[in-house]
Swiss-Prot record:
One of the GO BP terms on file: transcription antitermination
Keywords: RNA-binding, Transcription, Transcription antitermination, Transcription regulation
The family this protein is said to belong to: Belongs to the NusB family.
Any one GO molecular function term: RNA binding
Residue pairs linked by disulfide bridges in the UniProt entry: none
Function: Involved in transcription antitermination. Required for transcription of ribosomal RNA (rRNA) genes. Binds specifically to the boxA antiterminator sequence of the ribosomal RNA (rrn) operons.
Name used for this protein in its record: Transcription antitermination protein NusB
GO cellular component entries: cytosol
Domain of life: Bacteria
InterPro entries: NusB-like_sf, NusB_fam, NusB_RsmB_TIM44
Amino acid sequence: MKTYRRQIREKILQALYTIELRDTDIDSAAGWLLTQEILDDPNAMKFFNMLIGSIKAHMSEIDCYIERHTFNWDMSRIAIIDKNILRMALAEILYCEDIPPKVSINEAIEIAKKFSSTEKSSKFVNGILDAIFNELKTDGKIHKNGRGLIDHSTAKLHKNETSK
């Protein structure tokens, strides 16, 4: 299943949207949306559990980043889809160590193009995520390894130093 991460991102977005509209928890909402194909794939389930767990555990911290970078907007005025795309992408950037931040941002933009109601949403999502990413990078709060490294030359340098 080549696109399982995109499918899972879309399912989690739908779950986040559902909990904003109904009185339910994220696990129940996401569980209703999982396909058998995802349930049968251990890598897909690992990614699902990691991403949904990160969103649940760090929602208030993630929302603080969004609020800080949407200074002219009250969180309640941000479209539900856009807000939840931002939450999901930030959870990936901050807590999914093997996914490069630029991949998370690009995926968020593509999902915004597919699910948001206006053409401006993808630009809004891109601008907010880019600003938050730059802050996180400056503050040294992005911790990636393996395929998630931001700069592979750093990985080579570290590998060369440890092999001496």
